[in-house]
Amino acid sequence: FTCFTTPSDTSETCPDGQNICYEKRWNSHQGVEIKGCVASCPEFESRFRYLLCCRIDNCNK
């Protein structure tokens, strides 16, 4: 299973058990964006502008 990760923003193989890709962005002036692999989707927080969780290779591009 592969997902895009930050800070490199390249597709990488996820560790065993982490079969969800995610992307989240903050409500900040800089528009910080984090991408990677997780075992379960993080909970949405009010400081997030955007949260995506998906189960298809590289779906968080």
From Swiss-Prot:
GO molecular function: toxin activity
Main location per the UniProt record: secreted
Cystine connections: 3-21, 14-37, 41-53, 54-59
Residue ranges crossing the lipid bilayer per the database entry: none
UniProt KW Transport keyword: no
InterPro entries xref list: Snake_3FTx, Snake_toxin-like_sf, Snake_toxin_con_site, Toxin_cobra-type
Tissue: Expressed by the venom gland.
Keywords, in A-Z order: Disulfide bond, Secreted, Toxin
Gene3D superfamilies, A to Z: CD59 (2.10.60.10)
Keyword Disulfide bond: yes
Pfam families tied to this protein: Toxin_cobra-type
A GO term from the CC aspect: extracellular region
Domain of life: Eukaryota
Matching CDD domains: TFP_snake_toxin
Family assignment from sequence similarity: Belongs to the three-finger toxin family. Short-chain subfamily. Orphan group VI sub-subfamily.
The name this protein goes by in its record: Weak toxin CM-2
Protein species of origin: Naja haje haje
